[in-house]
Structure formats: structure tokens, C-alpha cells
Amino acid sequence: MTADNAIFIPPYKADDQDVVVELNNRFGAEAFVAQETRTGMPVLWVKRAQLKEVLSFLRGVAKPYSMLYDLHGVDERLRTQRRGLPAADFSVFYHLLSIERNSDVMIKVSLSEGDLNLPTVTGIWPNANWYEREVWDMFGIDFAGHPHLSRIMMPPTWEGHPLRKDYPARATEFDPYSLTLAKQQLEEESARFNPEAWGMKRQGANEDYMFLNLGPNHPSAHGAFRIVLQLDGEEIVDCVPDIGYHHRGAEKMAERQSWHSFIPYTDRIDYLGGVMNNLPYVLAVEKLAGIKVPQKVDVIRIMLAEFFRITSHLLFLGTYIQDVGAMTPVFFTFTDRQRAYTVIEAITGFRLHPAWYRIGGVAHDLPRGWDKLVKDFVEWLPKRLDEYTKAALQNSILKGRTIGVAAYNTKEALEWGTTGAGLRATGCNFDLRKARPYSGYENFEFEVPLAHNGDAYDRCMVRVEEMRQSIRIIDQCLRNMPEGPYKADHPLTTPPPKERTLQHIETLITHFLQVSWGPVMPANESFQMIEATKGINSYYLTSDGGTMSYRTRIRTPSYPHLQQIPSVIKGSMVADLIAYLGSIDFVMADVDR
């Protein structure tokens, strides 16, 4: 698989001001209020009356912002550090990404509590649909013209908007819960699918359509996930994905945990990603704190992150092949994952959820003998991947079930916010480790695997090749592990190095305060995205100068990937949907947070 040069991706330039010049030339500098942040991109506030015009301009400009990367809200009412910003009770931000520019821009709009209305942008970016629904669900902000503004994370019967600051964050602040028979029947009835509410017909010209629930408890749904299918025989006429069954309020939890104590919660976002989940969070916090970690920390973090990329991809490979009917490989891939977890456990002390990265470093140094364990694994895995390729991936039945199935092109992928292997399988050479290196990835030699058909088979093959590249990266970590400390010498490193606590009373006090109350981060905003196991994962943090986050926005790759399903699978067979779901590689914790 070789690189596709159809889209040239220039070197990354943080805080790229070119778009600001273009916007000022088009609308005038007075139309915007620039906000200084540590997000690495221009952040501009606009008036609501000009919002849609500005966004349309960015979508159609030369080298356009083809991807609506994220869209969400903030309850600004309790925020104290807002000097220089427009008055706002609530705000909504639009994070736009341009592949052709390799740069981002964030547009914000302020709203007053008595007038929480915005125009929908679903006509500009189709993936705005779910994001706008979630903003309404969590904050109660209306989007005029939205095709189906309804609950998406919370049940249809839910009352209130959970991410508002006046909404309780603890169960003890609610009345005791009781489930009466009448309430149970109400909840069950609320889940009944109404085709007319979604613009679907019950009959065609010569046929009656059948409506089938796939999930929320179905092995091929890969979690608590429901898709309602409109069927003409075996053909999918239309479908409606239904998410939220796995929602745990991760972003709300972040407002009640210290910067340090939230780290274990990040492990549970993509629960197969392990420390890969910690990485964007601690990098974003380190931007707030102004911490520069030692080189050894970067290399250790990369090595462990790539181990979890391999374990996640091995699980994907086994279940993907199983979804299309082959039973044996999944037992082998799970056994192979155990060998990786043996190494991970020896280094971190844990297996699936180590919560091992720290603000300013990692939990502890590499143990004695780590290098032999890593070396043995690096030498062993490539031969296993060769066996999988020969025995399973070249199988004619698997190819027949997946080649040409659920295919989409680069343009469609960008419009729906698709990242990771799903984007690179269309030939788009965009991998953050190369395009926007972080944690020292620019010092490693590896290739970005690509395919060109964008179908279910290509998505699988890209991930298999990614495992080979992860082995290359881990091998370079093994051969070039620097000497030095495993934590940064910085006042906000948490926990601080403990060796000095027995010698300096000030260090002991700092250690106690940072572990109990948590470190105090400067008031600002920061942002970090990484190339995670399932696509681009990012944390957008807002600090109000306290020990806890004022607002934590977690953007996960699986969320837009599931929203894309209807546009890809219409007109296909039910069996093709099963292959498509397997090829996406998602877990519902990553979708629902």
C-alpha cells in the first residue's frame, strides 16, 4: 500500500493565521473577537447573525474546511475568568478542520439564557446533525431548521439538560430512584420506533416495508447499540442508528474530579485503548500548565500507546473475521493479545486500564528486564500477522463478503467527520503522527498504510498494516530509549517526585495538596488531538483557574463513524451491514462517553 498524493497535505503550522486574514478581508476585522488560547488554532467569536455566513464561507473557501471536526457547547454562567470575551450565558463552538491546509479554526458564538437559538448547519456539514442534537440534549440550545432535534444521549423521557452548571452532578442530589410499573411501561413505550417521526413510509408503491430492530443487544452491534432498519425483503431502504445506551456522563464527571484524579476515567472512553486514552488528556493539561516533559517520558508514552494500538487492532481483526462467519481466528487473536498484555502488565502493573500516564510524566520508571519482554514480542508478532494474512485475509469467502461492500470516498469521509483507518482506506494520507507530530513522533521512522477503495476489506487491511508499523515504532523505542527522569521537574507535575518529600517540607506540602485537592491550573483553554486506535481522539479543556476543569469536551472518533452508517449502507443487504459494522471498529463507550 502506497501513499496517494491526490491531496497534498502541507507541514503543520500551529496557530495558522492565514484563515484569519481571509476572514478579515471578507467580513472585516470588526466582525470577530479573537481569543488567546493554548489550543494551537485561531479562536474567533462571531455574532449569531453572521454565524452561518461565516461558516459557509469557510466551507467554500479555496482549500476548504471540509470537516466539521467538532461542535458543542459551554455553560458560561459560572465562569469567572472571561476578560476580553463577549458576554455570554452559554456559548457554542464550531471546530473546523482543513486537510488541504493541515490547519484548524474554531468559531464561537455567544448566547443569552433567554434566547438559546441558533440556525442549523446540517446543510453545510451533514455530520452536524448528531452534534446539534447532543448540544440540545446536554444544554437545551435549539437549532432552527434541524431535521430531527431530539434526545440522543439521554432517554426520550429525560427531564433537564445534564451539562448545565445548575444540573446536579451527584446521585445524592436527586430524590431516591424508584421504578414503578407505570414508569417502566412508559419507558418501554418511549423506545417504540415511529417511522413517520423520521420521515419514513410504511409502504412503497408495491410493497410493505418491515422495520427491524438490530440491537441494542445483538452480538454484531458490538455493544449496547440499536439500529432500526427499514427493509424491503433483505434490502436496506433506510436505517436509524440509536445510541446513548452506554452514556456515563464522562464530561460531567470531569467537572467534579481534580485534573489528576480524572486520569482513570479517560481509560474508560475507548476501553480497548488503555493508556492511549490518557495521552491527549495529559498533553492538553500539560499545555495549560506549561510543562515540557523529558524525552524519556515521550518515548515511554509512545511505546505503550503503540502496544495498545496493537491490542485494539488484534481484537478488531478477530471479531471482524468472526462477523463475516469465520470462528477460529478470534480465539487466536485473543490469545495473541494476552502476550501483549503480559508486557504491558510488567511495565505498568495493570492490563486493560492502567491509568498510567501522569501530568508531567508517567507513574514510575521502566522496570528491570522490560527490554527483553519487548524484544521478544517485537520479534514474534510479525510472523503471526503473516499467518493471519495468509490463512484468513486472503480467504475467498471473506473477500467476497467485504470487497466492494460499504464503500465511500475521501470527500464523503471528510463530510461525515471520518478519521483514522476509515479515512486512510479511501487513499487520504492523513495520520496525525505524521501530519501533526506530537510527543516526538517526528523522530520515528514508519509508514502510513493506505488503501484506495474505501470498502470494508480495505479498512481491515489498513489496520493490519498499522500493526506492522506499530511494531517498527516499538522496536525503535526499544533500541533508543533515552536515559533520564520519568517525570518533569515542574511545580505542577502531579504527583511531584516523592524522593524529595522526606527532605523538603515545602515539597511534602505540595505533594499532599496536589494529590488531595489537585493541582491548580492557570485559567486558559487548551486542546490536544492524537491518532488513537479508532481515529482522532481529542480533549478540549477549559480551566477557570481551579483544581478542576470548568469544561472538558471529549471528541471521540467512533461517534461520527456511526452517524455515517445510513449514508453508506442504504441499498445494501442486511448481511452487508454486519460486515460494515465490523469494519468500522468501534466500542460504544467511545461513542457514548
Swiss-Prot record:
In the N-terminal section; belongs to the complex I 30 kDa subunit family. GO terms for cellular component: NADH dehydrogenase complex; plasma membrane. NDH-1 is composed of 13 different subunits. Subunits NuoB, CD, E, F, and G constitute the peripheral sector of the complex. The lineage of its organism: Bacteria, Pseudomonadati, Pseudomonadota, Gammaproteobacteria, Pseudomonadales. Its EC number is 7.1.1.-. Keywords: Cell inner membrane, Cell membrane, Membrane, Multifunctional enzyme, NAD, Quinone, Translocase, Transport, Ubiquinone. NDH-1 shuttles electrons from NADH, via FMN and iron-sulfur (Fe-S) centers, to quinones in the respiratory chain. The immediate electron acceptor for the enzyme in this species is believed to be ubiquinone. Couples the redox reaction to proton translocation (for every two electrons transferred, four hydrogen ions are translocated across the cytoplasmic membrane), and thus conserves the redox energy in a proton gradient. It is a peripheral membrane protein. It comes from the Bacteria. Pfam families: Complex1_30kDa, Complex1_49kDa. It is an enzyme of class 7 (translocase). It comes from Pseudomonas putida (strain ATCC 700007 / DSM 6899 / JCM 31910 / BCRC 17059 / LMG 24140 / F1). GO terms for molecular function: NAD binding; NADH dehydrogenase (ubiquinone) activity; NADH:ubiquinone reductase (non-electrogenic) activity; quinone binding. Residues 1-184 are annotated as: NADH dehydrogenase I subunit C. This is NADH-quinone oxidoreductase subunit C/D. PANTHER family: NADH-QUINONE OXIDOREDUCTASE SUBUNIT C_D (PTHR11993:SF45), NADH-UBIQUINONE OXIDOREDUCTASE 49 KDA SUBUNIT (PTHR11993). Transmembrane segments: none annotated. It is found in: Cell inner membrane. It catalyses: a quinone + NADH + 5 H(+)(in) = a quinol + NAD(+) + 4 H(+)(out). Residues 208-593 are annotated as: NADH dehydrogenase I subunit D.
